[in-house]
Amino acid sequence: MKYFTEQYYKACLASAIDGALQDDVRAAKSEQAYKDQIWSQSFRAFLEQLDLSGAEETTPAVVQAKEQFRALVSSYVEQLQELLPDNIRKNVADWELLAMNHASPALCRQIRRFCASNRRQMQRISRAYESYYKKACVHFKLDMISQIGFHDCLITEIVPQLGDLFFAFAAAPAHSYITAMRCVKCDVIKDDGLKAGATWLYEEVYLVEDKYELQVLVQLPNGAISDFVLQAQRFEFRGSIT
């Protein structure tokens, strides 16, 4: 892929780190009592999102929510440690506080500059692809190609049949009217990420001789980022695979 690579995907994730970030002087150092206080506040907010704010702590739903919240914080800590550069990581006093969007003012300034840089990178890449697509699409059948947009959609099935390749998707708000795509007279060029259970992230479309080439970035069920490439004569869309 030339535009929407794994680096682009990571830039997208990194660009959002400062979305709910709060300047907090007390987050400049790690204090267990203060972290417990922020943890309690954040967990209450999480329960409100689940409509469990009035439930007893011992109810199964709240116990499950607590486990889920801990897992979310732990997962976000891992993501932050992967995305943030060394010059920012070394200034993090408490990773769990940061994962709950509390950081010292100095650290917040660093992170906001980093996020802004990633947003600019995303914009440059998006504009470059848009420029390519604007020129290329004069040769595309737009009524067909414009329907390919399965961003963040789960691929539930991949079925080869008589030279074609079928994809089934879980319904999603952005494209709930399409739950299946048929790639007619399909050749698989690269199959690394061609896995049922993967999440479709981004695609690039090209015309190679008399076929459309679809390059797709996916997230595999284990969280790894991969891609696949296929060429097809045309694409057909419908509500389900039959």
Question: What label would you give each PLM region?
Answer:
Residues 1-242:
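Surface-exposed, interaction-prone regions used to assemble/regulate multi-protein complexes
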